[in-house]
A protein has these predicted regions:
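Glycine-rich phosphate/ribose-binding loops and adjacent secondary-structure elements
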Residues: 228-398
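Active-site-facing alpha/beta catalytic cores
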Residues: 120, 125-247, 251-271
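A structural-propensity feature for long, helix-poor, extended segments
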Residues: 101-103, 161-176, 180-183, 187-194, ...
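Flexible, glycine/charged-enriched surface loops at secondary-structure junctions
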Residues: 148-150, 250-257, 319, 428-438
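Conserved, well-structured core domains of diverse proteins
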Residues: 2-10, 14-116, 120, 125-136, ...
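Ligand-binding clefts of soluble mixed alpha/beta catalytic domains
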Residues: 351-431, 451-473
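A structural motif
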Residues: 142-143, 182, 275, 344, ...
Length: 473
């Protein structure tokens, strides 16, 4: 018995693999998996390590980079005419795009040829050439442009037909004489890409000229206040709006711009305070520079924003009296037509307008690489080293944006997207783009139906319970 046990023990010892054999075995079949974490992705790991080096949050421009996993305007489709309605002929029957804003109190409402406008972007965030090209291109298309943080450029006024003067919390560059030259005043409370915070212009873009306009030192980061210095809430804002009306002799409309947050309540408060026009900027909106986390983790999407805003105005029985402008990631004519159908009177564009100028165009590719970017995926607006001369104050880079050619590209794009809106309106039997309505739409996802109150395609059933659908049905 004992001998047999010893024999088995020796046999077991002999069968034990050597350390070398064990090592070879592990090399062939590694015990450690190469599957990346679903939580700590390579991008998250890189982000943590960069913050560990910098000891601060990350700043960039452009707007949210997250995959569009939420309900968007893409989740709606139009119902063209069949036997129930008669479509319009594309080249024989007209479809009006005339747009009027500010009819509530202003003596001279804003009258535009198209319902698409250039939103506020500052001289500082953008180059001189870019600001003038936006003004000239908007004029060529029969629409408006907006000043932005930092005041008005005289050349911007000279080259625009309709100019909206933006009044922001910073009050940089505010000039009463410039304000009185404007065709409308926009009192900005927030921005879709970074609601609840002020603007940011990094020192690399604060040239001597920008510093002089803003009365601040050159080469130093400029952080704008998050709230206005002379009012705190809606009751105080009533006085501010009256002050702006007095300054402009009650002639021009007063817009109030909101970053999409508590849209239903904010729109009601803005309308109650006396706004002629309410602007709501969704979370897909762009920015020249802000903390990355604000662009990715604040605000609500444009689709939800337009529905809540319309519901708020209808609740106050002011829909139609107070006009609604929607903004935030608007890309093409179908986005615009859907926004109009959901209740917007006009649409602001920012990033799309810059792309029409040549933003992200594959020119000067080596300069994209120098700032760690590539064409079609550059969001380095904050650096001041824009390869195509749009978001820079560098004189040499700025020369790359030829004003007349850029203005023509923008005007061409405006004409194209306006034609797209008309195509959809005619297909729905409408001779005016402002006659588009929720009945012309169907939702392709349950989420979109819940948010908009538009029936889910194939069911004709409305799902939901929020303010966005209560007032549409």
């Amino acid at each position: 018995m004992e001998g047999g046990a010893v024999s088995k023990k020796k046999s077991a010892v002999q069968k034990k693999p050597s350390r070398k054999a064990s090592t070879n075995s592990q090399a062939i079949k590694p015990a450690i998996t190469s599957q990346p974490s679903g939580t700590f992705t390579p991008g998250i790991i890189e982000d943590i390590q960069i913050k560990a080096e910098l000891a601060r949050y990350r700043i960039r421009g452009f707007g949210t980079l997250r995959p569009r996993t939420w309900a968007t305007l893409d989740d709606l489709t139009f119902l063209p005419c069949g036997l129930t309605r008669i479509p319009l002929e594309g080249y024989r029957e007209s479809c009006s795009t005339k747009t009027v804003l500010g009819t509530r109190f202003a003596e001279k409402p804003v009258e535009l040829d198209i319902p698409v406008m250039v939103t506020g972007m500052s001289y500082g965030a953008l180059s001189f050439n870019a600001k003038v090209a936006l003004a000239r291109g908007a004029r060529m298309a029969g629409t408006s442009t907006t000043t932005g943080d930092g005041g008005m450029l005289p050349a911007e006024r000279e080259n625009s037909k309709t100019l909206i003067y933006e009044v922001l919390p910073s009050r940089y560059g505010i000039n009463i004489h410039h304000l009185r030259q404007a065709d409308a005043i926009e009192l900005t409370i927030g921005q879709g890409a970074k609601p609840g915070t002020g603007g940011l212009l990094l020192g690399s873009k604060v040239s001597a000229q920008i510093a002089k306009i803003r009365d601040l030192p050159a080469g130093v980061d400029q952080r704008s206040p998050a709230r206005h210095p002379d009012f705190l809430g809606p009751d105080d804002m009533v006085l501010k709006i009256e002050e702006l009306r007095e300054a402009t002799d009650w002639k021009v409309p007063i817009f109030v711009k909101l970053g999409a947050s508590r849209v239903y309540d904010d729109v009601k408060l803005a309308a109650k305070a006396g706004a002629d026009v309410v602007v709501v900027d969704g979370m897909e909106g762009g920015t020249g520079a802000s903390p990355d986390l604000l662009q990715e983790h604040t605000g609500i999407p444009t689709l939800a924003a337009v529905c809540e805003a319309r519901a708020a105005l209808e609740e106050m029985k002011l829909y139609g009296q107070v006009q609604l402008i929607i903004a935030g990631g608007i890309r093409h004519g179908s986005d615009m037509a859907k926004a109009l159908a959901l209740g917007a009177d006009a649409i602001y564009v920012g990033t799309a307008a810059l792309i029409a100028l040549n933003c992200n165009k594959p020119l000067f590719v080596e300069d994209y690489h120098a700032i760690g970017a590539v064409p079609y995926a550059c969001h380095h607006c904050h650096t001041g080293r824009c390869p195509v001369g749009i978001t820079t104050q560098d004189p040499e880079l700025m020369k790359r944006l030829e004003i007349e050619a850029a203005a023509e590209r923008l005007a061409n794009w405006f004409h194209a997207v306006t034609a797209e809106i008309q195509v959809l309106a005619r297909a729905c039997g409408k001779n005016n783009v402002h006659d588009l309505e929720p009945e012309d739409l169907r939702a392709l996802t349950l989420e979109a139906s819940i948010i908009t109150g538009v029936p889910l395609a194939g069911t004709n059933v409305v799902f939901g319970g929020g303010p966005g659908w209560k007032k549409l049905h």
